[in-house]
Amino acid sequence: MDVSITSDMFNYSFKIEMKKKLRIFAEHGFKYIHWCDDWNSDVVYSQKEIRRYSQLIETAGLRCIDVHGTATSSIRIDAEEDALQDQYLRLLENRIEFCSSVGGDAVVIHPPRRRGKDYSPSLKRSLRVFEKVRRLCEELGITLAIENCFPEDEEAISFYLDKFPPEFVGFCFDSGHAHINGNFDQLMGFGERLKALHLHDNKGEKDDHQPPFWGTIDWKRILRWIKDSRYAKPINFEITHNPEFFSGNADEYLEYSMSAIQKFISLPID
């Protein structure tokens, strides 16, 4: 079973420059990455930057399987102001093109957050974005994978999956968010549309993004569900180093993470 690691693993602690961090991912046994840099910024990659990142990934001996889309607190998929939603649209188009250029097949996006009792205005507002990027996604072979983020996300995910075909819209499962929100049972029903994975552990309280078995997630249940789903890509881990939890250096954290990952994928499934 092949595995993948998120590219922003050290962005919030050691801040290792791109070329070096890609190299050490490969040195510790990873062959695949999920691109998660700039996931919460308004950075638009230039064609020169896209070519550079693509070359760095290839030179490191890695393959990018999918890309995290980007947004900010105001530049959202359901932004009420057209100018802000247009900015979101530009960012999403940029990441779709980037994903295609680096060899990925899916861009992960966050659904709108419920604002008030009625969810439908935000969901309907977001449809403008899907309609605008659909042709680009189809031309480049990119799927939009809706990530579970909040307790009410099953409603949003169902809304999008019912409205659009699997070639265009799929599901990104985030184990940490599901554990905090207590909605894994509801999310299991989306296994047929599983297109991307954000696997990481926590203790049910904070979004700690730690390796398997660090927290209290039932990893055997998750592995069984993934194997029963239609997911066919490398298993991706959205693990990020936090010096509050691990005092060693980057190499030691990668060794610890890879050991936990190997334990996870080797779990016996009844």
Regions found by a protein language model. Give the residues of each.
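Charged helix-capping and loop-helix junction motifs
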Residues: S46-R52, Q85, L89-L92, S120-F130, ...
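Histidine-acidic metal/acid-base catalytic patches
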Residues: M1-S4, M9, I16-G29, E154-F173, ...
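Hydrophobic residues within beta-strands of alpha/beta enzymes
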Residues: I33-H34, I65-V67, V107, F171, ...
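Glycine-rich, proline-tolerant flexible connector loops at the mouths of alpha/beta enzymes
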Residues: H34-I57, P111-K117
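N-terminal small/glycine-rich loop or linker at the start of catalytic domains
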Residues: M1-D8, D66-D78
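Acidic (Asp/Glu)-rich catalytic clusters
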Residues: K21-E27, Y45-V67, N94-G103, R134-E139, ...
